[in-house]
């Protein structure tokens, strides 16, 4: 067979619904509120063919720049050969969901504000930057009366 050039070529598993999730789309999908500036994940839903994003945007994260009755406009970065372009696409809300990529950052901002407030009241300095995990503390290894065994590599022998 020849290599077809259809819009949905190679999407047999990409746009298929998960096991036991076929049929009517849950109403919660339509009840979600999207505002300008929201960060959303694009994931095509095969149940709804209208307003489906192209397969190249599947799994990408973008920012909402426009909201209409049934769809939203999203700015997504797309790599075209050597350059990254900011593409503006219109996608129906069935094919997007709020991204969790910013949740950890926003949680950290709240915690840092709380730490700053407490430190200001006490008049102390507080470390706000995340620190890498330090090396483990020194400790003794129990051998249970057994002598440690010395391991060394076998010397190389050339066999002709």
UniProtKB/Swiss-Prot annotation:
- Location of region: Disordered: 112-145
Q: Which Pfam families match?
A: Ribosomal_L21e
**What InterPro entries does the record tag this protein with?**
Ribosomal_eL21, Ribosomal_eL21_CS, Ribosomal_eL21_sf, Translation_prot_SH3-like_sf
One Gene Ontology CC term in the entry: membrane
> Which PROSITE patterns does the UniProt record give?
RIBOSOMAL_L21E (PS01171)
Q: State where composition is biased (Basic and acidic residues).
A: 112-123, 136-145
Single GO molecular function: RNA binding
Q: What is its main location?
A: cytoplasm
Q: How does it assemble?
A: Component of the large ribosomal subunit.
Q: What does this protein do?
A: Component of the large ribosomal subunit. The ribosome is a large ribonucleoprotein complex responsible for the synthesis of proteins in the cell.
The family this protein is said to belong to = Belongs to the eukaryotic ribosomal protein eL21 family.
The identity of this protein, by name, is Large ribosomal subunit protein eL21
Q: Which organism is it from?
A: Homo sapiens
